[in-house]
């Protein structure tokens, strides 16, 4: 920050377009290192790098994403697939920060939401989703993005871009808690503490 000079570049792949916005940083106990992570806008892929800025893992997801989020209160990286097309943009992939493997997938349908194990395909949790319809009366597939941890650590909040609501989920499990409705194109941040800065 003092010299405002380039420190390094992280190569995420020959055709990858990492999103320049919010990434994630977390400590991996097995490696004993602080790791970094980003989604890629045009690929279903989360890129993980170590504290030497070397890429150590490419984790497949459902499609291109914009945001990946975490905090010390959740065991997961929460990666959206909002640019992955209609078949994928209603899911968020939860990656275990210690194993660096996909742990569960949140999917929000037009009438039901699920949290599933990606290996066994077992449904871990499910809930009823209020159907939102367009001007022609057709049910809208929720386009979900930007998992944001609440400051108190109990919840993670996920925007539903085209449905005017935010989904609240348990940070430790991904289990659905409730909706906040009546919003217009919710996209970004909800935790004031995460965006405050101290002048000086």
Please report, for each region that a protein language model flagged, where it lies by residue.
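Predominantly soluble domains enriched in secretory-pathway, periplasmic, or organellar proteins
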Residues: 1-200
């Amino acid at each position: 920050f003092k010299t405002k000079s380039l420190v390094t570049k992280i190569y995420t792949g020959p055709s990858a377009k990492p999103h320049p916005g919010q990434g994630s940083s977390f400590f991996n106990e097995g490696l004993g290192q602080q790791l970094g992570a980003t989604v890629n806008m045009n690929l279903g892929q989360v890129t993980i790098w170590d504290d030497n800025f070397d890429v150590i893992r490419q984790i497949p997801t459902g499609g291109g994403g914009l945001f990946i989020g975490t905090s010390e209160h959740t065991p997961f990286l929460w990666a959206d697939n909002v640019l992955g097309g209609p078949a994928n943009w209603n899911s968020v992939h939860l990656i275990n920060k210690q194993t660096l493997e996909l742990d569960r997938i949140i999917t929000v349908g037009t009438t039901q939401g699920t949290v599933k194990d990606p290996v066994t395909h077992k449904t871990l949790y499910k809930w009823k989703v209020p159907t939102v319809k367009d001007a022609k009366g057709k049910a809208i597939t929720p386009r979900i993005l930007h998992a944001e941890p609440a400051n108190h650590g109990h919840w993670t909040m996920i925007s539903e871009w085209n449905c005017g609501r935010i989904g609240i989920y348990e940070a430790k499990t991904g289990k659905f808690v409730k909706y906040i409705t009546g919003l217009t194109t919710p996209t970004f941040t909800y935790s004031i503490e995460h965006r405050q800065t101290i002048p000086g």
